[in-house]
Regions:
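A conserved donor-nucleotide-binding helix/loop in the catalytic core
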Residues: 43-67, 77-82, 172-173
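Intrinsically disordered, low-complexity, charged/polar segments
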Residues: 265-272
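N-terminal anchoring/stem segment of glycosyltransferases
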Residues: 1-52, 62-63, 164-167
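Catalytic core and acceptor-binding pocket of nucleotide-sugar-dependent glycosyltransferases
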Residues: 115-213
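A short beta-strand micro-motif
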Residues: 241-245
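Basic/aromatic-rich interaction segments and small domains that mediate binding to polyanionic partners
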Residues: 250-265
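Conserved donor-nucleotide/metal-binding helix-loop-beta segment in metal-dependent transferases, i.e.
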Residues: 75-105
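The conserved acidic donor/metal-binding loop of glycosyltransferases
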Residues: 68-72
């Protein structure tokens, strides 16, 4: 079994004590420590974030497991056995994100965190609408682990949409998954992760560096959500669950049932049921 990752700017160190039963490859690191083997990145992509996504999306192996570099230190023998069992049963597996975002919520998060600007999100939404994307069927993925075999068509389509939709790859993944009609297996992320690590809200899986970059000013996504609701036909009451922590002002989007009670006094409800 091949396990691979992509690492640009050396934002984490490659762990050297990896479980047996797999070959380990890294894109973007020359002369990595054992057991890692180095593979080259393309030369035509200058942005380090986009570069790190290139081989994540355009998987060069017939059969492999992609793992985000920031989570490699959490892999163990149980993970190897789990991946082997999945590959015996299916050609493609991806986790469902615990927040279970709708399309509106996913876009709102990208803008609010300064990851993708409003113009890009609106143009992307209009283009996938013309391509026949069903917004009410949006699947909320967590792409830190991808277990796949011969998914060349999906990979190509994913990259095509990725370069149009901003620096994050979940939105374009969901679009490619639906439009390619790829058959896949999935599981709730926490349920899957708890089989080899701690995926609960305060678990070790979430204690890492991720998404600490900005490509636009960001801010309150309410105006953007109004525009996207009109384009997509998605009802805001049902498809935009938003709240804010009273103490910090942090925006909470999507399914928050694992973190807060229904009428939790620490929250200011912005929208949704």
């Amino acid at each position: 079994m091949i396990i691979y990752t992509c690492l640009t700017n050396n934002y984490v160190s490659l762990p050297t004590h990896m479980p047996t039963g797999a070959e380990y490859y890294v894109f973007g690191v020359e002369n990595p420590p054992a057991p890692w083997k180095s593979l080259p990145n393309p030369k035509h992509i200058e942005d380090p974030i986009r570069l790190s996504r290139y081989h994540k999306i355009n998987c060069p192996f017939d059969e492999s497991v992609y793992v985000d570099a920031s989570r490699l230190h959490l892999l163990n023998d149980s993970f190897i056995g789990l991946c082997e069992a999945i590959l015996r049963e299916t050609d493609f597996f991806v986790m469902q994100h615990p927040h279970k975002h709708t399309y509106l919520e996913e876009c709102a998060e990208y803008f609010s965190r300064g990851w993708v600007d409003e113009k890009t999100l609106i143009e992307f939404t209009e283009e996938i609408k013309e391509s026949g994307f069903k917004f009410n069927k949006f699947f909320s993925p967590m792409c830190t682990i991808l277990i796949r075999r011969n998914q060349w068509h999906l990979n190509d389509l994913w990259w095509d949409w990725y370069v149009k939709g901003g620096i994050r790859d979940q939105l374009s993944f969901s679009v490619a998954l639906q439009l390619s009609k790829t058959k896949f297996d999935t599981d709730d992320a926490r349920s899957f992760l708890n089989r080899f690590t701690d995926g609960e809200p305060d678990g070790v899986w979430w204690k890492n560096r991720t998404g600490d970059y900005k490509y636009c000013e960001g801010g309150d996504p309410s105006h953007l959500v109004d525009k996207l609701s009109k384009i997509t036909g998605l009802n805001k009451t049902m498809r935009y669950r938003a709240a804010r922590l009273k103490k910090t002002g942090q925006l909470i989007l999507g399914d928050r049932s694992k973190y807060f009670t229904k009428n939790d006094p620490v929250l200011e409800i912005i929208n949704g049921i």
